[in-house]
Amino acid sequence: VDITGPLTSDGHVRGRAIAVYQTNDSFIDYRSSRKPSAYAIIEADLGPNTLVTVGGSYAEVNNDGALPSLPRYSDGSDLKLPRHTNLSNPWAYDNTRAWEFFGQVEHHLANGWTFKINAMHSDKELDRIFNYTSGAVNPDTLVGPRYAAGRVQTTNKQNVFDVNLGGAFELF
């Protein structure tokens, strides 16, 4: 869904909103994903020289099942497993969520100069439970691969503030 247009009759306030939902199933065992996301922005002319912009976005990626990691024989040959084989467990997942909010004030001054103030805040979260195999399989004993599992949870927050004055001037 993508909606864009003026929010006031004179067009001095405009907006856009986008929402997307994507799902994927895989031929690989235990593997699928869901990806909702949204974005919105509003621009307002506060006069002939001043523009205010605010907006935000949200994105989520939910992957069910870990990425497959198939071993090979120690001589490099293929184990001839079916193409859909995934040695990870069905309970494995990899989820990411991200929020971002932003704003800007832009004012055009005399003689082509521009003054801008920008602010942005973002939050990102990762939650992953995974398992994998590593190592080669001995073709004679069928021994060798190692199995491991783990969990990762992280949060990253960021705040950015920027003030900018730009324009042409003669130095010499």
Region locations from a protein language model:
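Transmembrane beta-barrel wall of Gram-negative outer-membrane proteins
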Residues: 1-66, 91-110
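Extended alpha-helical regions
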Residues: 39-41, 83-136
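Short alpha-helical linear motifs
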Residues: 39-43, 78-79, 140-141
